[in-house]
């Protein structure tokens, strides 16, 4: 079944294009995960990002970031969607960006960690 969300469809196309053109295999992996049913998309709390992310790293969440937990590391978090509290907490110590912006800033996909 095709995706009915036009933003998600164009995001998947952009991810695949970035993976083909710049060789960033991480973007192809994220595109494959987003093509699966929505119930399998990641829902990641800030505590998990704090546990697994390194300083000055880009964390990609193929789904939604939720606001439970504390984030103290200076990381850039890229996701399809953020809860209101998650975006506020991330912006206090790091940067919350959309996946579209992450592809623009880093088309090769270097120093990226996918968390789900």
Swiss-Prot record:
<dbReference type="GO" id="GO:0019843">
    <property type="term" value="F:rRNA binding"/>
</dbReference>
<dbReference type="GO" id="GO:0006412">
    <property type="term" value="P:translation"/>
</dbReference>
<dbReference type="InterPro" id="IPR021131">
    <property type="entry name" value="Ribosomal_uL15/eL18"/>
</dbReference>
<dbReference type="InterPro" id="IPR021132">
    <property type="entry name" value="Ribosomal_eL18/eL18-A/B/_CS"/>
</dbReference>
<comment type="function">
    <text>Stabilizes the tertiary rRNA structure within the 23S rRNA domain (domain II) to which it binds.</text>
</comment>
<dbReference type="Pfam" id="PF00828">
    <property type="entry name" value="Ribosomal_L27A"/>
</dbReference>
<dbReference type="GO" id="GO:0022625">
    <property type="term" value="C:cytosolic large ribosomal subunit"/>
</dbReference>
<dbReference type="InterPro" id="IPR001196">
    <property type="entry name" value="Ribosomal_uL15_CS"/>
</dbReference>
<dbReference type="InterPro" id="IPR036227">
    <property type="entry name" value="Ribosomal_uL15/eL18_sf"/>
</dbReference>
<keyword id="KW-0687">Ribonucleoprotein</keyword>
<dbReference type="InterPro" id="IPR000039">
    <property type="entry name" value="Ribosomal_eL18"/>
</dbReference>
<dbReference type="InterPro" id="IPR022947">
    <property type="entry name" value="Ribosomal_eL18_arc"/>
</dbReference>
<dbReference type="GO" id="GO:0003735">
    <property type="term" value="F:structural constituent of ribosome"/>
</dbReference>
<comment type="subunit">
    <text>Part of the 50S ribosomal subunit. Interacts weakly with proteins L4 and L15. Has been cross-linked to L4.</text>
</comment>
<comment type="similarity">
    <text>Belongs to the eukaryotic ribosomal protein eL18 family.</text>
</comment>
<keyword id="KW-0699">rRNA-binding</keyword>
<keyword id="KW-0689">Ribosomal protein</keyword>
<keyword id="KW-0694">RNA-binding</keyword>
<protein>
    <recommendedName>
        <fullName>Large ribosomal subunit protein eL18</fullName>
    </recommendedName>
</protein>
